């Protein structure tokens, strides 16, 4: 077979594209559970950081257990303040909820107790200069004083 002919070059390129495509697809599918677990742990770290557990001192492995200990109360709230049954607050995507009409939205509320005081953590999301910004703010019991905040964004400045 003459490796300098166009037929060989196109066949070789096609085979390489198919092989690499199959490998990448397989890797993406097999790594998806690990990616989702990392996103979940990072979200827990972000929420924990608002009530005094900095990310630098709370490894992801510890954040999973600590989150359950710190936030004994979690609610999915409707617009009227009533509790939405059957919905896990941690699984709520604020980006998806904001696309719904106000009457259909469900928002998470996390309640922690630290040093005998209840802290209420609420999520935030909005538009930044280059893309969406999201975060969490913890409020003291009076609901007027901010105890802590954590913000993040998807991309760097272009």
Predicted regions and their residues:
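Flexible, solvent-exposed loop/hinge segments and secondary-structure transition points
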Residues: 2-158
């Amino acid at each position: 077979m003459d490796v300098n002919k166009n037929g060989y070059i196109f066949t070789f390129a096609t085979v390489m594209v198919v092989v690499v495509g199959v490998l990448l697809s397989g890797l993406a599918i097999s790594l998806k559970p690990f990616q989702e677990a990392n996103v979940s742990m990072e979200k827990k770290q972000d929420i924990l950081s608002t009530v005094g557990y900095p990310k630098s001192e709370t490894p992801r492995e510890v954040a999973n257990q600590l989150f359950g200990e710190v936030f004994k109360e979690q609610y999915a709230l409707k617009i009227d303040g009533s509790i939405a049954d059957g919905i896990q607050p941690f699984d709520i995507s604020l980006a998806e909820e904001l696309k719904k009409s106000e009457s259909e939205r469900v928002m998470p509320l996390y309640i922690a107790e630290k040093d005998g005081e209840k802290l209420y953590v609420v999520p935030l999301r909005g538009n930044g200069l280059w893309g969406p910004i999201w975060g969490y703010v913890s409020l003291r019991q009076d609901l007027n004083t901010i105890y802590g905040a954590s913000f993040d964004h998807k991309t760097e400045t272009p």
